[in-house]
Amino acid sequence: MEPERLRRRLGSAFRVRGLLLRAEAVKYLTETLESLNEEEFEDVIDKIIDAVEKQPLSTNMIELSTVEAAVQECSQALDETIKNVFNIIGAFDIPRYIYNPDRKRFVPLSMTNLPVPNLFGTARDKAELFRERYSILQQRTHRHELFTPAAVVIHPDDNRSKFQLKTVETLLGNTAKVREVIVLGMITQLKEGKYFLEDPTGVVQLDLSKAQFHSGLYTESCFVLAEGWYEDEVFHVNAFGFPPTEPSATTRAFYGNINFFGGPSSASVKASAKLKQLEDENEDAMFVFLSDVWLDQAEVLEKLHTMFSGYSSAPPTCFFFCGNFSSAPYGKNQIQSLKGSLKALADIICEYPSIHKSSRFVFVPGPEDPGPGSVLPRPPLAENITQEFRQLVPFSVFTTNPCRVQYCTQEIIIFREDLVNKMCRNCVRFPSSSMDIPNHFVKTILSQGHLTPLPLYVSPVYWAYDYALRVYPVPDMLVIADKYDPFTVTNTDCLCINPGSFPRSGFSFKVFYPSNKTVEDSKLQGL
């Protein structure tokens, strides 16, 4: 590209993002990028600007050193290696991004005045937890076509189908009756038997006597779009709906190639053509998901024998074993018993050399496995329990609950929790169609952008690590390992599966094929 035209394009691209380039920075970029054609330039400049915005900027005037660091980061990102193909990411290793409403961008924690996360959170962490959940849903809702006013209104009726979000504060400031208003807020029960709607600006009492509930599980502490009218300090709700979901591609089109997911790659793996090609070519890749793998039960070990025997001729890429790993609740002998059970599993795996050499094994702890209580995220099983197994089966990973899996360009979240029953028990109003619970459940999780949209006394969370439970941007696959009946549901381009409880569901499990994104139901009953 001609230097003069390149300079103009550079200035324009940075100005669109609200940034200005110093003369020496323009000169450096012109020399670096002059060999690129038009299409390559568009792709590369977006990555460079994304890398610039990740750095702590005190002003919108971009210096040479900032640009040099961004170009260097992009060069490293392009140098993809085999380590980016398959990664298990623990909950405590996920990067934290905070939404900045002024810049309308997500910025890394290092660019904010918030402290580094700590298990023993402060009161500020608890307040920040709900504020961050709210701000993520608010920016997503504002961007939805129903809430985006047309740039040019040709006819007054054009904007009638558009909605405008109000805050609780605007309701409380009115002495007259306010008709037809929509508010985004969190359902809370500040007084027993009375529900309120809360947002960062205030709290208003709700009258739900005439409220219609759209599909989903409306629990306390979940965020809703409430439509109704306000009078005498009470918001009379006509209808409740969830904030609209947003496909991952839409989110990334707006925020660029930020790696929200975690892993070794500096940019999102979604942008990698090399990894996408590897993913398409490797048609034999296969992931096997099992939950409630009770290793202390002889029948379970026998069925695992049968499963390994069946897969020995074509070993899966990875087996994902979710807890609980013991049928008995936590007790004084459980740790010793679990060590022995894992040793028995390792011996079975060693009987099948092809699986032992080729397959990986990932273990996600369950709510009743040994650990520091029921607070999420849960750390992995203790090293002294798993040491012998890891020596016998080197390709094994004991990870957190929840955890994330990055395979080529695909992003998978795995969560072991009996969540369906918990959410049904804590519904403000139970859905009329109880036959369709899996669809209600999946819609709720993806709309909330969070794995546990429940009160903290029902599902406790380490306040400063609440971001590790986010489901935003929407992953390619969400595995909720629950004792509820197995299901497979697709929503917002996300495949959501529950393998069910292995011993309780006739030894059923799920098999996922990443190359064509299909899920197969499998069962060992009667074999």
UniProtKB/Swiss-Prot annotation:
GO terms for molecular function: DNA binding. GO terms for biological process: DNA-templated DNA replication; error-prone translesion synthesis. Its main location: nucleus. One of its GO terms (cellular component) is epsilon DNA polymerase complex. It is found in: Nucleus. Disulfide bonds: none annotated. Keywords: DNA replication, DNA-binding, Nucleus. The keyword Nucleotide-binding does not apply. It comes from the Eukaryota. In eukaryotes there are five DNA polymerases: alpha, beta, gamma, delta, and epsilon which are responsible for different reactions of DNA synthesis. Accessory component of the DNA polymerase epsilon complex. Participates in DNA repair and in chromosomal DNA replication. Belongs to the DNA polymerase epsilon subunit B family. Component of the DNA polymerase epsilon complex consisting of four subunits: the catalytic subunit POLE and the accessory subunits POLE2, POLE3 and POLE4. This is DNA polymerase epsilon subunit 2. The gene is POLE2.
